[in-house]
Regions:
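Structural signal for conserved beta-strand scaffold positions within catalytic alpha/beta enzyme cores
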Residues: 49, 80, 102, 117-119, ...
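Conserved beta-strand segments of alpha/beta enzyme cores
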Residues: 46-48, 99, 116, 139
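Active-site cofactor/cluster-binding pocket
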Residues: 61-115
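Short alpha-helices
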Residues: 106-171
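Fold-independent oxyanion-binding glycine-rich loops
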Residues: 20, 52-53, 81-84, 103-106, ...
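Hydrophobic helix-and-loop "lid/oligomerization" segment in the mid-to-C-terminal part
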Residues: 2-21, 29-58, 70, 74-75, ...
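Short, motif-level signal for alpha-helix interfacial/capping segments enriched in acidic residues
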Residues: 1-4, 81-82, 133-135
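Short glycine/serine/threonine-rich phosphate/pyrophosphate-binding segments
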Residues: 25-31, 87-89
Length: 310
């Protein structure tokens, strides 16, 4: 699996790395980590990263996207990271590349790249890339290791999710050997502004429940406009306020925006991915997302979640 990816990387002098829009720690970590991995082992290659702003994760080193013209894609390899559907890829110009390569740990929803390295047994795309480096004998540098470790930490819920296994800790340990400061990293990841803490309190009071105890939050466009946070902070950031409620196995956050309703689906017990896929989304068995057209459709999704069985 990894050999084919390495040969494709060796083949091209210009490589452009994409990831999903509204990036999380795994998307940014895998993008920066892959760039540093390639530059460390093949210094003669030109490597770019592209996409929308890193937002919450802008503290990560060298994560600012490069501004490149279309002709850079001529005879270039585009690497797509941490993305299962085309609609989520930030910067659609990957289609201009000579060839495409994807690394992902989500359930496959679409054929996107010429070569796919997809394995859902990894807790993160960063974990997959770390194993790729170790198994192919590629060298890491400190920035690559720190970036990849960041993605592993965030996508595993600080190593608490079901996706974590013994391999996760072996890979994390290999990265930690590079000696970066984890205390500083955790402070950047988990110390919040007081406004975010107040926002969590507000959203905790918005929680409602279905007859089968699915927890859910609905934010209308007007409510979103009234809070001091962007749509990603509300959608992805507030879904976690429902995660530690006793007796709640499944929860969902609906955030209405100008372009549709952002849906974040989570469960401790059930596979929510088929529900997300039904509405054009995807992700993992117990953490998926989708964007749907309106709140009426959101109620249909909520009904489907309420009827989940093992």
């Amino acid at each position: 699996m990894f050999k084919q990816a390495l040969e494709l990387i060796k083949k091209y002098d210009t490589i452009i790395i994409h990831r999903h829009t509204n990036p999380d720690g795994d998307a940014i970590g895998s993008q920066v980590g892959m760039k540093e991995l390639i530059k460390t082992n093949f210094p003669q290659k030109t490597v770019y990263i592209v996409g929308d702003d890193a937002k919450r994760f802008s503290f990560m080193e060298d994560c600012s996207p490069d501004n490149i013209p279309n002709n850079v894609y001529d005879n270039a390899l585009a690497i797509i990271l941490d993305t299962s559907v085309r609609s989520m890829i930030s910067d659609g110009r990957y289609t201009l590349a000579k060839e495409t390569l994807r690394f992902d740990h989500h359930i496959k929803c679409e054929d996107i790249a010429d070569v796919d390295i997809i394995d859902t047994s990894y807790e993160s795309c960063c974990g997959l890339i770390t194993d790729f480096a170790l198994q192919t004998g590629l060298k890491l540098n400190v920035l690559a290791a720190k970036s990849l470790f960041t993605g592993m930490v965030t996508d595993s819920g600080r190593f608490r999710y079901d996706s974590v296994n013994a391999r996760t800790f072996r890979l994390a340990a290999a990265l930690k050997e590079y000696g970066f400061d984890t205390n500083k990293l955790y402070a950047n990841l988990y110390a919040d502004d007081f406004e975010i803490i107040k926002l969590r309190a507000i959203y905790t009071l918005k929680i409602k429940f279905t007859k089968n105890n699915v927890a859910y939050i609905i934010t209308t466009k007007d409510e979103l406009a009234a809070v001091k946070a962007d749509e990603f902070t509300v959608s992805r950031g507030m879904v976690g306020v429902m995660s530690e409620i006793k007796g709640v196995d499944t929860w969902v956050n609906f955030t209405e925006t100008e372009s549709g309703v952002l849906c974040e689906l989570r469960s401790k017990r059930y596979n929510v991915n088929p529900v997300a896929a039904k509405y054009g989304g995807g992700g993992h068995a117990k953490a998926s997302g989708a964007t749907i057209k309106d709140l009426e459709t959101a109620m249909d999704m909520l009904k489907d979640l309420d009827e989940l069985k093992e």
